[in-house]
Amino acid sequence: MNTEKISTTVPGRIFIRMMALIMESRFRYKFFGPEEILESAGIHPNMHVLEVGCGTGFFTIPAAKMIGQGGSLIAMDMLPESVATVKEKVKQANLSDIVEVTRGDALNTKLENKSLDEVIIFGVIPAPMLPMDKLLEEMHRILQTGGILAVWPPSWVHKDIIHSGRFSYIDRRKGVSTYRRIE
């Protein structure tokens, strides 16, 4: 069962609400501050970034502020509830000129080839509906040569990313593993 179908069931909706509460908890902000994690991913001004699985927007607003007016952030999620929540947060933060919030599929983003500086995948993997081979193929397609793929956590996907032949390992800081797109 995929994420979209899960969100239409009563247990699925309850699970999604519980996860949203956890994602927005003060504990998470205190011990897993989004700014520190984004800095470890190498987010900086003027970048063009895709956030896969934006969820509640925990990383979206801080990332947009770090990227600034010269860059752009596409916050993508499959769940309409997540998209609506993040759109409202972006509007309230006055960041609509930097952030595009969209409902979409990470396996088929419909973005242009080599159009992004970085893709961040934070807290999405391991999702059973995201086959790593197809996900990595799509991320490789949309990243510029030398573009960055940042994954937070888990570390066990490292082998899949390296064995794909599409990315080379850069480093791991504050739990964020970064990889460079290769031809």
Where are these regions (language model features)?
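Conserved alpha-helix/loop element of class I SAM-dependent methyltransferases that forms part
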Residues: R28-P45
